[in-house]
Amino acid sequence: MRWMVMAGGLLAGLVASAAAAAPAQIMPHRALYELGLAGRTSTLVDADGAFAVEWRAQCEGIASRQRLWFVGSLPGGGELDYDVRFTTWESADDRRMRFSMRSYQDGRVVEEFRGQARMPEDGGPGRATYTVPKGVEMRLPPETLFPTAHMERLIDEAAAGAAVVSAALFDGAGVGSEALTFVTAAIGDPVAPRDEIGRAWPMALAYHALAEGGTDTPLFELSFELSEAGVMRHVRLDYGAFALKAELERFERLSPPRCE
């Protein structure tokens, strides 16, 4: 299951004012969301769980940890216990990434992916190499973005007034089209600051198999209100057969590292 590929970014159409502004940096933070079903479906009639996100700055990059878990009630009776954990580390220059994803269903591991990816400085194609499953390699198109860079680019473009943006994204949450997608993001008008999280923008992202050029039915859809600090509110994850909603319950700012 594709569960949470964080936010989108741009490959082209940069607005001149964005180049003059300081690039976005995600605020190191930890957030906990209450998770539930966004309407009864033929797949699930109820769901109860949580979604946790942590972004921790390091001297040479940024590490993220995400976990989504819920117990879903099935139409014919019975329950589904689902738990997925996803971690990444990305270098400060946005060119290197390590990733790990493991999902559980009813307490059993059903999927696991681990590896690393790299994009070259010359703007050419990159490569992802998996240790789980062993021996799997993927070619990444030129200018493919990793998740943290993807999110920061989207914030930059929202601040510059962009309304529709698109990008190739690699997140490591699978292999093939599960990990490498073409993302189109629609950005709404900014929401005034309410607290330390700052101003925010409503966003709707559609994830397509990259080979299809983003023209067919999306594999996955994601919407949220994203702040300039990288904090999400009002999250909706649409898998097609069912959709989940997540509301921010707790937020904690984390201290930055001391780097020489």
List where the protein language model places each region.
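Beta-strand elements of well-folded, non-transmembrane domains
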Residues: L35-G39, V53-C59, F70-L74, T88-A92, ...
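Hydrophobic/aromatic-rich structural module bridging two neighboring secondary-structure elements via a short loop
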Residues: Q66-M119
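Positively charged n-region of N-terminal signal peptides that target proteins for export
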Residues: M1-M4
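Mature, soluble, non-transmembrane domains
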Residues: S100-E260
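Short, hydrophobic/aromatic-rich segments at coil-to-beta transitions
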Residues: Q25-E34, E60-R65, D94-S100, G198-H208, ...
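N-terminal cleavable signal peptides for secretion/export
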Residues: A20-E79
